[in-house]
């Protein structure tokens, strides 16, 4: 099985979640071995989507350096992972990816329009060989060896609308599109107001987030899934793990995880070469792992 890129260039436009300004986005094909690269056209600077380039995880996953940064990359990265795309250049004219509708379905539609092109170099996959875990109080994220890639995610909020939710996701592109891609980011009205006081979250609205005010959902259309909150956390986790550079063949388990914990997990994993193996999917090995690309 070979690496892929997109078959043709596609363009889109959206709003930035934090600045609230229009953002142009363009996806361009790249050759094998290039990986996922973000290009700030307004600065003329490129950033590879890798754990070592992450500079902030407080509100979103942010890559960059002293010259500039690209924020809120996780939803786009999640869609790229689901479509099995190894190499693509993302051109942005601002410091964040557009929020779209708060989920990754808009990016999935862009990738559908672009199509997928197979390249002439074998695809790689990261196989988990032993468990790696990161904890913060009672919160944790863990990667473990498995025969089938599973994401088992639990969240628990002191709010009756969310409460405790668990979702077990068996990874495949079709499952992702049906179960995960449409799950939107969410937040509490009081937090939105605090963010705006700091000149952040200016692009957030009921058009691109589920907003909760005490015991009610403000979005007139309600939820897309009864457990949309935990499904979106899975969407985020997939995006964060994509910074490892290839699809992860492992069992990801989380209780109250976050962008911060996901980033620390990728760093902890890469510190221990015995915890993983990067496998080249030549014909002789592909059958063992083909389920992850179903």
UniProtKB/Swiss-Prot annotation:
Active site, per annotation: 259
Top-level taxon: Bacteria
InterPro entries: Ribosomal_Su5_D2-typ_SF (IPR020568), UDP-acyl_GlcNac_deAcase (IPR004463), UDP-acyl_GlcNac_deAcase_C (IPR011334), UDP-acyl_N-AcGlcN_deAcase_N (IPR015870)
Annotated Zn(2+) binding sites: 75, 232, 236
Keywords annotated in UniProt: Hydrolase, Lipid A biosynthesis, Lipid biosynthesis, Lipid metabolism, Metal-binding, Zinc
Catalytic activity: a UDP-3-O-[(3R)-3-hydroxyacyl]-N-acetyl-alpha-D-glucosamine + H2O = a UDP-3-O-[(3R)-3-hydroxyacyl]-alpha-D-glucosamine + acetate
GO molecular function, one term: metal ion binding
Record's GO cellular component terms: membrane
SUPFAM superfamilies: Ribosomal protein S5 domain 2-like
Cofactor: Zn(2+)
Pathway involvement of the protein, from the record: Glycolipid biosynthesis; lipid IV(A) biosynthesis; lipid IV(A) from (3R)-3-hydroxytetradecanoyl-[acyl-carrier-protein] and UDP-N-acetyl-alpha-D-glucosamine: step 2/6
GO BP terms: lipid A biosynthetic process
Pfam family, one: LpxC
EC number(s) from the headed UniProt entry: 3.5.1.108
Task of the protein: Catalyzes the hydrolysis of UDP-3-O-myristoyl-N-acetylglucosamine to form UDP-3-O-myristoylglucosamine and acetate, the committed step in lipid A biosynthesis.
Family (UniProt): Belongs to the LpxC family.
Name of this chain's protein: UDP-3-O-acyl-N-acetylglucosamine deacetylase
Source organism of this protein record: Campylobacter lari (strain RM2100 / D67 / ATCC BAA-1060)
